[in-house]
Amino acid sequence: MSSVKVAVRVRPFNSREISRESKCIIEMSGNTTCITNPKVPPGTSDSIKRFNYDYSYWSHDPRDAEFSTQSMVYADIGEEMLQHSFDGYNVCIFAYGQTGAGKSYTMMGKQEESQEGVIPMICKDLFRRIQETEGVDLKYSVEVSYMEIYCERVRDLLNPKNKGNLKVREHPLLGPYVEDLSKLAVTSYQDIHDLIDEGNKARTVAATNMNETSSRSHAVFTIFFTQRRVDKMTSLETEKVSKISLVDLAGSERADSTGAKGTRLKEGANINKSLTTLGKVISALAEVASKSKKSKKADFIPYRDSVLTWLLRENLGGNSKTAMIAAISPADINYDETLSTLRYADRAKQIVCKAVVNEDANAKLIRELKEEIQKLRELLKAEGIEVQEGNRRTPTPMICSPNRLRKRTGSSTEMAVDQLQASEKLIAELNETWEEKLKRTEQIRLQREAVFAEMGVAVKEDGITVGVFSPKKSPHLVNLNEDPTLSECLLYYIKDGLTRLGTSEANVPQDIQLSGSHILKEHCVFENKDGVVTLVPHKDALVYLNGRKLVEPEVLQTGSRVILGKNHVFRFTHPEQAREKREKPKDKDVGENPGGNAEAADWNFAQCELLEKQGIDLKAEMQKRLCALEEQFKREKLAADQEFEEQRKTYEARIDALQKQVEEQSMTMSMYSSYSPEDFHQEEDIFVNPLFESCWTAREAGLAAWAFRKWRYHQFTSLRDDLWGNAIFLKEANAISVELKKKVQFQFTLLTDTLYSPLPPELAPSPIIGGALTNGQEDEFGQSPIPRTIVAVEVTDTKNGATHHWSLDKLRQRLELMREMYHNEAELSPTSPDYNVESLTGGDPFYDRFPWFRMVGRSFVYLSNLLYPVPLVHKVAIVNERGDVRGYLRVAVQPVMDEENADFNNGVKQSARIVFDEEQNGGHKIPKIRTIHDKDEKYIEGSNDIMKLEELEQEDADSGRGDSSVASELHESNEHEPGEHLQPGKEFTFRVTVLQATGIAAEYADIFCQFNFLHRHEEAFSTEPVKNSGSGAPLGFYHVQNITVPVTKSFIEYLKTQPIVFKVFGHYQNHPLHKDAKQDCQITRPPPRRMLPPSIPISQPVRSPKFGPLPCPPSSTVLAKHDVLVWFEICELAPNGEYVPAVVDHSDDLPCRGLYLLHQGIQRRIRITIVHEPTAEVKWKDIRELVVGRIRNQPEPADELDDSDSCVLSLGLFPGEVLEVPGDDRSFFRFEAAWDSSLHNSALLNRVTQTGEQIFITLSAYLELENCARPAIITKDLSMIIYGRDARTGPRSLKHLFSGQYRNPEANRLSGVYELSLRRASEAGSPGVQRRQRRVLDTSSTYVRGEENLHGWRPRGDSLIFDHQWELEKLTRLEEVGRVRHLLMLRERLGMDTTPNPTTKTEKDVCNLAQRASASPVHMVIPPSPQTPVKDQQTPTLPERELTPRETELVWKCVKLIQGRIGGKGDPSDTSNQLAVDASPGDEGCADMNASYISGNSIELCSPDRVDIPNGWEAPAPVPQSQEVSLRLYVPELEEIRVSPVVARKGYLNVLEHGGSGWKKRWVTVRRPYVFIFRSDKDPVERAVLNLATAQVECSEDQAAMVKVPNTFSVVTKHRGYLLQTLGDKEVHDWLYAINPLLAGQIR
């Protein structure tokens, strides 16, 4: 056995590719061929594809050192194949590739020296070796045949008598062969060369008549090579017969690449049918070769689907040594075709051939043929026909009785005669001697010469047609063809006198005979008088001369183009005129003589000339079409712009109206809070009341806008939706991590973009829908929005001691790779080099790269002391992202008033120059900063997020202590012009000194610090790393940085409001590289995909013509879930008039899978039975519609919509009925529908299914349930095979044949498991319905495979939101404390704290309460009620005394402000109780949320539903009971469950149902989380289903003692209980482990 040799050869650019400036996308290195995808960015995983072959020939540029010539190709492939033929093997070489890729050049070559192809070289070398080795004991004989396969028709190219299409037959020994194909004997290479030339000319004549090109046909040149050797010792003659098949395939390009239309498109499809079948054969053979030897199933190879593959059957995977040469183009414009060719060749490389030496086959063959002839004669004699010996044609009937004649059948007689004639032809061919073969070859040559002479084709004196030489004196015509290989192959002499041209049917013999469309019987006459040739057209004949239609006679000039009819193109050549022109050059018109050279006119030139002269200018037509397209584009663009402008105006008007409405509602609600309750009892229009007239000041309007903006950015519900909706993905990732033994854990976390915790770009939130903006942008009020919070995934890498943050999108992307790592095998070609799993997945999806240094925390130092100017030494806290203080940093900031340059012995001194430029942009001042380091100037745009000092003043004014405000005094002192050191235009230098860091944990080894301005994140000033010994001693940096700034307004504004950010980094001690650890990159190879069972995808419902597109199911709470078992049957009309279920093949052994075996042309019905546990919530009323569509021959449905699917059919229905099954108390509902499959107008359903094919359909049943607003939809994909009307649809395997299950009619059904969810229907117009529909279900409790390995781990939920609010509160307090501390230090430095402001007793009490609140977490602060004595709530350090009513009111007001509440004067405890009471007992989710809000006491939403209801208001009246009943509607949702193919356990169990009659032996299969119950192991239909996810499993000795039955355990579902007994003692634990592994582990 040996595999097919595959070589790839790339050709140079052609003129078309050069004109388009194509790029080379092919690279070759050794035997590896690489192709680059020009449509994919370089560097990606799909940009370069590599393939390995036996040979890779680089023939792109002759100047390259690696250039491969024709002789090199022959030396590698041709010589090896020729040696195999001498050894007695069959040999085949075939070339494959798109048109113009170089197939014909590689196989045939050119006439020039060293340009010959593989075929001439093999023939030449064959006869050279014959001459060298032939002797007395060794004789050779060579025969050749040449045929063409075009559109599945075979044509003989060597025998002119075989004008028709030859038949392809198959012999038991010879295999497929072509009947009556000429096999001509040859004795030298010149004979073969002449025959090839003759065959090409016959191919040219036929192609011209039929308007074909050689690129659209396959050519097969076969050499039959026989060796006869005489053994001297035994005097026996042995014989070896080798067959050398040389195949030139048709072009493999696509239809859209060639632009073919009409007939040429159909022709291409027919030709591509052969190539497609060849591809299928190669793929099937490669699949067989890659399968294991244990596979006993016979694989089907589609040889008979095309003539080409049928004839090449021995060469493809049979008795042959085969080589394939794939010719490819190097241009990027042919990427798709080139890649297809490379993949084709890659598959062919895997084919294994089993070649044997062909010895002494003739004697055996002759004997078997004689025996077959004798049997056929006896068969004919029995039928009443006697065939005499030697009579091969006409049978002689015997005299027989009339009864005997009536028994004869004409078809069998004709078939027997046909077989007899074919066998006798083979015997005659085998018995023909070599001399007879040579004589027959000579006769065929003479016949061929006569035929060519009759057609007018010029021949030499020896009878060979003119091909490569041109006459020296006689004028002549040379053919031109679209295919360059067929051009200038035929030459027609113009004799002296008249040369007539027409068809063979003319009354007067024609000298030149043509055929084809638009050629008249007498078409034209060439008159040669004294060397001057005149073309005389006949009436109504289509004759074109140089593109002009010829009506009158005209003299021909050498080089003229003559077109006769539609297809025949010639160039007229007169040697005498050409010689005169060379001697006396004259200026000729370019149109009459292109380029001054007659030979330059080819077929393309003649066609373009014809179009141009007939008034069809291609360039003008293209320009005209282009102009029309441009005009159309302009019109469409103008219309689109106008439509867009109208939509923009409409949306702007709607936005303005909504904005105005929101503002009015906000102002109305503000007025409500100040309106007295008694005023509402007065009967008047409240909006006419002057109280509701807007009389706000600018400050009040700003506060209202601020409150609205703050309310708009609350996002607790969306965060909860993200947590609930993605919990299942988090659980699955953790489960896979545990099963693969990855040391990675995933958990939810919340991230907010703050100063201490800026978000990286990959985690930055997207814009809020509805008008909100992203971070860093300003809203319509000119204010920076509140930072958004996102849900992220915290990845704890315990292997590397690292922590990463992933976005939810990244988690889903990585989860796909985790699933692929766990389930699927990377599909790579076995011949592809550098096989590496990591090249596909990009590394391990569980791990990320981690930096060497990690962030310890951030600090902020304000610079307002430089305004005065005074030096300050700051001690600022180093705070991490969670608000934890990780240490302290001492930083000194001081102005440099003169050019001092003191020496710093222990520190580092550096200088930098920063320029603040002012730029006006949209009315906002934006500092544009540029920094100069080492005299290099860089411009960096600054940030527009600038805090204004006036805001601080407003905050102090709100506190009621304007007289003691720190910022107000500093602001007043700085209202005047800045000091002399900050005059605009001057330069100001200040110094930042990083002194020490204290309190940093010992887990960080090397500590260094970076600091920069807020608007400059890309460049920073950095200190040197300092060792951290962990002893607690301060870490001294003593880094000095001088900064010089030209003073501008932007710089002064920055000094007033903005700090410098300091980032402290440390090297983590537990870094794995400390121990020279290396990341384990080994990835366990996943199981092959072929080991996993094939699955039919779950389709979406087929759209109903009656109901139309149904709205999306609501996201309301699921009230109930039920497991539904559905049985599907297709019934056919039986002879007794009843509808019997069609046979279902369950041979796949997969759950809920089967194949319907139907008959063609029989009436059918579809029967569906629904089985479920009895419940009051599910009551089936009737079937409303049954729709069948999406008819296809592959499992996956097409992407087209049901609207465009013409095969969708609504079936006629029969009323549904409720069944009562004796002994089964489950609910059964069954309905039927009449199915006339012919109404689909689908060929797949109308015809008998082909071998190896299956038909798939999708049906959807729309059922009506009680108390449901919408129909329930059952959707199922069914597969089937349609046999003939009288065919037997039996089982396909012996297992099912002997099991007898097909004799059971109840086995001929298919099961489906569905989950019915009932949701509360929501009114579309109810308030807040859109917000409620946005909520998602909590998926944290959904079962995930492998969840039991997590040992109780759960994803975090609502508590994470409140914990994060406390973290944000800590960050806000730390930021404000740092700013106030800086201002207090500055006041003290300036001497402004000499007279401290008096503090009242009330303020002290408020401060004490605030201190107590800050000392404990927020969720521990429970405010006391006013009735509780204050002394019980105070700390022991405060004096005990009663508060006055005024003090109590102030205390509660301050506490509410701290806790972020806005409300009236009611008691908070009363409000909490009211909220708890209002929560509906049935809505557990809402009750839990309210409880968490109450217990949390954190910041609440400032929405109207959270505002305390003033006294005197009445709650809305409850809904009447009758109205509530009428609105109690559900929305059903039926979803098919994909049952796992993995069987955890199966076997017999004794089953006792609760309330059942007794124990029953049943076959039970566990496919988690379901248990299926069958009647027996031979029963293929699921009879009952148990859902383990909602069941309780118990096994105890007490239970066994109570029932007095050993080896039992119980399974209790929501509706019934089962008692299961195993057949043996040892099986109990195994069954428990399959059903409930945790319970089995506890028992064991």
UniProtKB/Swiss-Prot annotation:
Signal peptide: none annotated. One of its GO terms (biological process) is vesicle transport along microtubule. GO terms for cellular component: cytoplasm; microtubule; microtubule associated complex. Residues 574-591, 969-984 have a biased composition (Basic and acidic residues). Residues 358-436, 631-672 form a coiled coil. Residues 3-351 form the Kinesin motor domain. SUPFAM superfamilies: P-loop containing nucleoside triphosphate hydrolases (SSF52540), PH domain-like (SSF50729), SMAD/FHA domain (SSF49879). Monomer. GO terms for molecular function: ATP binding; microtubule binding; microtubule motor activity. It is found in: Cytoplasm, Cytoskeleton. This is Kinesin-like protein unc-104. ATP binds at residues 97-104. Residues 1428-1437 have a biased composition (Polar residues). The lineage of its organism: Eukaryota, Metazoa, Ecdysozoa, Arthropoda, Hexapoda. Residues 1542-1640 form the PH domain. Belongs to the TRAFAC class myosin-kinesin ATPase superfamily. Kinesin family. Unc-104 subfamily. Residues 499-565 form the FHA domain. The keyword Cytoplasm applies. Its main location: cytoplasm. PROSITE patterns: KINESIN_MOTOR_1 (PS00411), KINESIN_MOTOR_2 (PS50067), PH_DOMAIN (PS50003). Residues 574-598, 953-985, 1419-1440 are annotated as: Disordered.
